[in-house]
């Protein structure tokens, strides 16, 4: 059976510093879920646990008290509205969420491809070769942690933020070693974490299809399961999301067996 698009597990509210849109509220996110027939949605604002050293000046205000301002989330019959976060991984591969905090979150999204945060995640002057090596190193670091992987999502593996230009971005994806991707995604599949189908990752032109899909094709071949994430920061970004998700499902030939289920 074809993969059914019935969820969105990566949504920001106005509490995320990169959003701050007054209409990006839990109530409007719930309306978006109802309008699209979703059974599960999850709020995932940017978060750095204040008990973990190393937060950048941008991340530091986005602490526990800050993201918990969304609670309690509005609930209606037929829709699971969950409370999660999108954290980060610094240059030393320190995760921005402490082990104890996982119990307070329904879902934790970990982006290993935020290679645009100078000083926090990168120096800023890395070559494509170095960025490809970081892609491998950072995912490897996360998969080597002692985490409750049944509620962990690996965000946007083909994120445009991997490099400062489209040319370098595509070059970086080409440089990802096939054998390393196979090793990492085989491990991810065995651990049971989800791999994100981020709507923004699937807006590429046709001529880029082969290169952008590389990580996803390997992940599928290795038995990984996938979840949909709009990564929306404001209401207008909900427009076209279903078409992007459908494109991902069709290009990868996903079925219900390929779906990550957040229990």
What are the residue ranges of the model-derived segments?
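Charged catalytic cores and adjacent phosphate/nucleic-acid-binding surfaces used
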Residues: 1-14, 167-263
